[in-house]
Amino acid sequence: MSQTEEKKGIGRRVQAFGSFLSSMIMPNIGAFIAWGFIAAIFIDNGWFPNKDLATLAGPMITYLIPLLIAFSGGRLIYDLRGGIIAATATMGVIVALPDTPMLLGAMIMGPLVGWLMKKTDQLIQPRTPQGFEMLFNNFSAGILGFIMTIAGFKILAPLMKFIMHILSVAVEALVHAHLLPLVSILVEPAKIVFLNNAINHGVFTPLGADQAAKAGQSILYTIESNPGPGLGILLAYMIFGKGTAKATSYGAGIIHFFGGIHEIYFPYVLMRPLLFIAVILGGMTGVATYQATGFGFKSPASPGSFIVYCLNAPRGEFLHMLLGVFLATLVSFVVAALIMKFTKEPKQDLEAATAQMETTKGKKSSVASKLVSSDKNVNTEENASGNVSETSSLDDDPEALLDNYNTEDVDAHNYNNINHVIFACDAGMGSSAMGASMLRNKFKKAGINDITVTNTAINQLPKDAQLVITQKKLTDRAIKQTPNAIHISVDNFLNSPRYEELLNNLKKDDQA
């Protein structure tokens, strides 16, 4: 294997790990927001203080949210059975450290117990006497839950206490030394070229929850989510950009600032690598502003939208929130404008930059791909139904795997029994939701009413999936998750000619 291929393989594995972390947190963001509203509104210094209702905030962050995260992690590994026992075992960590929200502990315990439950069943089920299945299933789960709850209480809890102490001390040291803005030097480039949701939800969300539970709010929720640096880049393109980049920057700015989908500005930075300086300085400015004003959120600002920022702003600190976003935007814009004004035009166009971003992130971006319109054709050979046995031998060659499943030849498949189409993306929320909504509208206009269209994360694709639509860089992972399904790859969730081809095939099968 060449060094380049090895690096790509490592990148895919790290991206998949980051995706797994965010898949535990993102489905539970609604619970975080509900807790944040209760804390912001009903606590003593909230918008409408209520002593009785304020008592909800503590148990929610101490028990409810860690249990939800543990359940999500266990379910990702071993469906409901893994999720239930994972949540059970996590109680050991929670009870051992009742004063610290055990989000990190839940993120460890959930997948671990889910995996152990899976291995336990694989060991016991083939040896279970006929007629004793329910007894063995229930007792094996109960015994594992018992053992892991004790292990969580006695082993993982002390370890988590030590880890949380080290991390808290590190964050506090940065805050007291007024060095927290320096974190942006790592965060801003990392989220553009590699990990996005994993940084916010895998690192800042659990640490921020611990800080918010103790101090009432956390600045950590603002570090990655501030829409200002990205808006500054896009404003610079609106004024000083040329061609396609300038024309598309207006729509991108609206999607980014109000929709909170940050990945849409990543290609604009990659077109001119010097713009990394602009987003870093913009991010540092935002963090420095919030640190100087003592600003923070009570719950995660997800997605990183200005609307979410407005809704999450604590009482009496709305102007502080506006100031942080405005200054981050201003600094990013000024630096980007200077770079664009006094440096040469990039050799790389927007389409190439989008492709580069998707390669480094190990995933395709529908909102970024919306900026360009291109379809790439690859040679295809056989239907997915005949390829399940060959998948394992192609795991290390994503292109061959896609060829083997005819992912870009819509006409190569039989759609007679299809009644469910699933759009799958990394997190299962933003881009796949937009793609599913768009295809539902196309089906409605075409009079196709007997096919359901939904969206999900790749990690949560059901084993009995019939037809899965993914962006090309993610299709190999989707195939490994659901090898029996028909898989279609697109370059752009919102603008692909393959949808019309799919509609034509479905109409033919319906008329046959």
Curated annotation (Swiss-Prot):
Residues 365-376 have a biased composition (Low complexity). Its main location: membrane. It is a multi-pass membrane protein. Keywords: Cell membrane, Kinase, Membrane, Phosphoprotein, Phosphotransferase system, Sugar transport, Transferase, Transmembrane, Transmembrane helix, Transport. It is found in: Cell membrane. Its EC number is 2.7.1.197. The EIIC type-2 domain forms the PTS system translocation channel and contains the specific substrate-binding site. The PTS EIIB type-2 domain is phosphorylated by phospho-EIIA on a cysteinyl residue. Then, it transfers the phosphoryl group to the sugar substrate concomitantly with the sugar uptake processed by the PTS EIIC type-2 domain. This is PTS system mannitol-specific EIICB component. The gene is mtlA.
